[in-house]
From Swiss-Prot:
PANTHER family linked to this entry: S-ADENOSYLMETHIONINE:TRNA RIBOSYLTRANSFERASE-ISOMERASE
Gene3D superfamilies tied to this protein: QueA-like
Subunit architecture: Monomer.
Encoding gene per record: queA
Descriptive protein name: S-adenosylmethionine:tRNA ribosyltransferase-isomerase
Amino acid sequence: MRVADFSFELPDELIARYPTAERTASRLLSLDGNSGELTDLQFTDILEQVNLGDLMVFNNTRVIPARMFGQKQSGGKLEILVERMLDDKRVLAHVRCSKSPKVDSIICLDGGYEMIMVARHDALFELELQSDKTILEVLEDVGHMPLPPYIDRPDEDADKERYQTVYNQNPGAVAAPTAGLHFDDAMLAALKDKGVNTAFVTLHVGAGTFQPVRVDNILDHKMHSEWAEVPQNVVDLIAETKTRGNRVIAVGTTSVRSLESAAKASPEQLEAFSGDTDIFIYPGYQFQVVDAMVTNFHLPESTLIMLLSAFAGFDEVKNAYQHAIAQKYRFFSYGDAMFVTKKAN
């Protein structure tokens, strides 16, 4: 398939640049992958889409304030976007400036902190913090929330809360697992009251999630790598859920990719998983774990819309997106959501 097959025209006014006043105030488009049937709902109606005994799997990564500003010793301004924390002092990062910093050069950050450029790894720079503080402490002090480029505004204080799930736990993401942004504590309690079980995986979303696919044929695309973990207790809950005949519902494409990465690593029987994953899911993929998913509306020609097309059918997703645009759903990270059931293999 061609990347252009996943293109669509989106009016600029449908890009959500701010979240709704309340997390659950978004709209929800339900898509049945088998029939293609679409239903316009409110996000709170998700309670009617799930059943007693279903298992909802969330990504509990925490977004770090990964964007920092500073200057080189020469005085040239630069912007750093952390891609991955290597340890308490070292990071892999994207560096934007007029001329790339050289190995062993010093970068002066806002707040008086300094980093040394240790090495370059393709498009990424390995930087080491020169401070008694940890990199996380420095990010919390002078870092900015790494809003996606299409939001096209400076980050604000409110983004520290709203570009973060309420159940976040493990710091490391530089982009939010956005399907989870719609859930508040009251909604999680309501799911529990209905008898829906919950479980948590971790996938530290990288900045690569926003990188365009730069090839014509999707088979030529090299997926970026991210760290993921599926604990043993989640594996056990999945087995119990499947045995009962209930569904595994992944909240977000990152939860889907975590679970399917675990299945790929142990194809005979699902096992706990921890490590890097570069799984690329596109039409033709046979899902091993996930039966339904909650997801936001994705960028045209992105690997995420390819994943959704693999899950619910290419034509079905294309039709759903045309419907969403006609009905003026809000798109991307701060936008509305979908509840999607899998198309039978």
